[in-house]
């Protein structure tokens, strides 16, 4: 009887060891399966994300995916614009001879500086990050600022009077509205509003082009040339192929330089 009891105990201990061993093996197997499934899901998610951005790169407010070299070129190109904006400010401050010219020059510089800074920073951040999506809003908003600030010396110093002031106020009310829409809805959801507004604001100078042609043909040609360069830059921008965004940046730089030369030589 005692021998039977001992044998049963031994069998029980053996069963417990086997159960524990089986439990450990099962636990390892489950953990391994979990990690494998998690890895597969992660890969599937990334593949789905890649397909989404490949087919619909601009369908929502996520930035399009570009190569590292492209983004370096984009950041450096408009980073150089920041330096040029500071140099431009130094030249303008040396030339201005009135309070209104000083104010107009500072507004003009602010628009140039903000646009090139926001653009350079936006293209510096890694794809998929929240900060990149945030700076994309800043980047698109700064286009409005550039247009309005470029007009500041023209409407305040060249046009002047009641018409110049009213024009300046109305234009900036539209600009603030556009920036607010980008802030609330993002840069892509209302493109059918923003792109026409960019165009209308940019070419609103037609209201006083006859005066420019009659009194300052050289100023007219510089401003017109800059506007044409900006518009030509929209071709690679809208195509949105490899390196095309970098080409768009070069057009923006050239357009800004050309119009600055006209404003510096014939207005300030």
Task: Report each predicted region and the residues it spans.
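Multi-pass alpha-helical transmembrane bundles in non-GPCR membrane proteins
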Residues: 11-268
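Short, Lys/Arg-enriched N-terminal segments with co-localized hydrophobic residues
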Residues: 1-9
